[in-house]
A protein has these predicted regions:
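C-terminal catalytic "cap/lid" subdomain
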Residues: 1-137
Length: 137
């Protein structure tokens, strides 16, 4: 396994062009040019934190469901809001599990450190307000 390095090299103009377009792809390469696995939510959260130092920032995570669901098989079981106080019981009860855990934990860290809100929603719901909003308590 290739060791991880914490040095990032990038072309700033490429990053700003993508941010201004509202899209950020997270292709991460190792020292030898090999493509590495990277959590896109972690990258998006880090970029949002940087943006929050400059201007009020809201972050949206898009995926295939309308948001965080109490029952993954029931699209009407949407949880409208999650905070640092309401998250632990959801995790303990298994309502939040698997890949949703890092998504919500990244969102909670982002709002704790200055991002106004993080919304988890389907790309089909970008303009209609449907989704789960993660807020600071």
């Amino acid at each position: 396994m290739e060791p991880l390095y914490f040095f990032i090299s990038f072309e700033p103009s490429h990053l700003f062009t993508r941010i201004n377009a509202g899209v950020l792809l997270d292709f991460i390469y190792g020292r030898k040019g090999t493509l590495l696995n990277c959590n896109a939510d972690s990258v998006a959260s880090a970029v949002a934190l940087g943006a929050a130092e400059i201007a009020p920032t809201d972050l949206v995570f898009c995926f295939e469901k309308a948001g965080v669901l109490r029952n993954p098989d029931d699209d009407t079981s949407l949880i409208r809001e999650i905070t640092a106080a309401t998250y632990p019981p959801l995790k303990a009860d298994g309502v939040v599990s698997k890949g949703m855990i890092p998504k919500i934990e990244n969102a909670l860290k982002a709002v704790e450190k200055g991002v106004r809100s993080v919304t988890i929603r389907s790309s089909e719901n970008l303009s209609n307000g449907i989704g789960t909003v993660i807020r600071n308590s």
